[in-house]
Amino acid sequence: MTKPIILTGDRPTGKLHLGHYVGSLKNRVFLQNENKYKMFVFLADQQALTDHAKESELIQESIGNVALDYLSVGLDPKQSTIFIQSQIPELAELSMYYMNLVSLARLERNPTVKTEIAQKGFGESIPSGFLVYPVSQAADITAFKANLVPVGNDQKPMIEQTREIVRSFNHTYHTDCLVEPEGIYPENEKAGRLPGLDGNAKMSKSLGNGIYLSDDADTVRKKVMSMYTDPNHIKIEDPGQIEGNMVFHYLDIFARKEDQADIEAMKEHYQRGGLGDVKTKRYLLDILERELAPIRERRLEYAKDMGEVFRMLQEGSQKARTVAAKTLSEVKSAMGINYF
């Protein structure tokens, strides 16, 4: 029986943080280890260039860092094909063919793109590559005939646009060579969008309000101890608010089942007064370190031989290119432009 295919990835614009870990990485490792799927995981450097065109050095540096993060959380190149987007030229060619099937108006209506354009403050200077990156994503997904794509809820419009492109292509060229993907969305809304340590709506590399998978134990401790709690909880005996308190928000996400009773008791104690923020932060720190310590240890080990890390990426890219080339050939045959 053929295994369903999963495609997932990240933009290499910096090291990955806890938001990436609970939002996608942890689930990827789970899906990989279930051994029910054929996994493709990629570093979307071409997509990163759509809004970092003048920061190619950052992207180059981030390739190695993100690869280390992948390996340290448990992604295994023997079980998952890990590759670099720019090393698969077939993806760019597929994008060109798909762009002929999507109107500019449709691209401009994509809610995800509209939101990101506003957030990035492009104004009238929107890079054309950024505007069409949903088409590039469709090429990434369809090149590997992915059945399933794990994404955040904010990416639903991107999946739908890919499905539209697939239907349009298959209808236009009377073929079924492209596969309509389904999105896999987070069940835990809190985990799907982890807030920053400062209470900002999202943990973000650009805002510097996150805990990175590469942070050492002392850095993690300092960041946890500076987390946003209840600004009105000045004295230990004061009643405290749980809502909007990042320490309790993180506890809800990272705690295991066996921790739940203790956390509920802490919440009640905090709300009636008599429990200080330092104690709750230390409790959270222990829980985070339980998760981060083995990741940190593996990362340090892999970092000793970056040559081997890049050999892994090269081998994965070669494997991925073979698959993408086969799909491209099928696409060109359907279009009637496979001349030789």
From Swiss-Prot:
Alphabetic keyword roster: Aminoacyl-tRNA synthetase, ATP-binding, Cytoplasm, Ligase, Nucleotide-binding, Protein biosynthesis
Gene Ontology CC: cytosol
Gene Ontology BP terms: tryptophanyl-tRNA aminoacylation
Predominant location category: cytoplasm
Any Pfam family matching the protein: tRNA-synt_1b
Subcellular location: Cytoplasm
Residues reported to bind L-tryptophan: 140
Binding residues for ATP: 11-13, 19-20, 152-154, 194, 202-206
UniProt motif 'HIGH' region: location: 12-20
InterPro entries: aa-tRNA-synth_I_CS, aa-tRNA-synth_Ic, Rossmann-like_a/b/a_fold, Trp-tRNA-ligase, Trp-tRNA-ligase_bac-type, Trp-tRNA_synthetase
E.C. number: 6.1.1.2
EC class (word): ligase
Molecular function in Gene Ontology: ATP binding; tryptophan-tRNA ligase activity
Motif 'KMSKS' region location, chain numbering: 202-206
Reaction(s) the record says it catalyses: tRNA(Trp) + L-tryptophan + ATP = L-tryptophyl-tRNA(Trp) + AMP + diphosphate + H(+)
Protein purpose: Catalyzes the attachment of tryptophan to tRNA(Trp).
Membership in a protein family: Belongs to the class-I aminoacyl-tRNA synthetase family.
Record text on subunit structure and interactions: Homodimer.
UniProt protein name: Tryptophan--tRNA ligase
